[in-house]
Swiss-Prot record:
SUPFAM superfamilies xref list: Lysozyme-like
Species, as recorded: Bos taurus
CDD domains to which the protein is assigned, alphabetical: LYZ_C
Single biological process term from Gene Ontology: fusion of sperm to egg plasma membrane involved in single fertilization
Chief location of this protein within or outside the cell: secreted
Keyword S-adenosyl-L-methionine appears in the UniProt entry: no
Residue ranges occupied by any C-type lysozyme domain in the UniProt entry: 36-163
Role played: Sperm surface membrane protein that may be involved in sperm-egg plasma membrane adhesion and fusion during fertilization. It could be a potential receptor for the egg oligosaccharide residue N-acetylglucosamine, which is present in the extracellular matrix over the egg plasma membrane. The processed form has no detectable bacteriolytic activity in vitro.
Keywords from the UniProt entry: Disulfide bond, Secreted, Signal
S-S bridge residues: C41-C161, C65-C149, C99-C114, C110-C128
This protein's name: Sperm acrosome membrane-associated protein 3
Amino acid sequence: MEAGSWAPRRWPRPPGIVLLALASVLSSLLSSGQARVYSRCELARVLQDFGLEGYRGYSLADWICLAYFASGFNTGAVDHEADGSTNSGIFQINSRKWCKNLNPNVPNLCQMYCSDLLNPNLKDTVICAMKITQEPQGLGSWEAWRHHCQGKDLSDWVDGCEL
């Protein structure tokens, strides 16, 4: 073997994987420019203004608890699932059913792009979350809420907030 002729073996990559990785990087870059991390009380006031207090029988504290355990109050949070779907925004809404991502064959029940869920003004996110909550399982649609908030005393989530 001659010096300098060795090169690492290149493994072929399926184009879909490369495109998914590129889309993931672009999504992260785009969302990071507009992301916002709310404080607990600031988010409580915003969600109250959107009418989530008492919506479908859930308290404002339920929503704040969900947002904390789903995203840490970060509007730009994006999580990639093993099945290729993504969870987006402060409530980590999944692209498998609720929003349009790269896969054109999803129901898109919220009739919006997943990137809309990264907007710090939360309007689209709240509209979609309200639609999800209309499902029979309500906030139970979110694993984070079921594991961390359901059936617990959540009063601390809004204590001290001037609402």
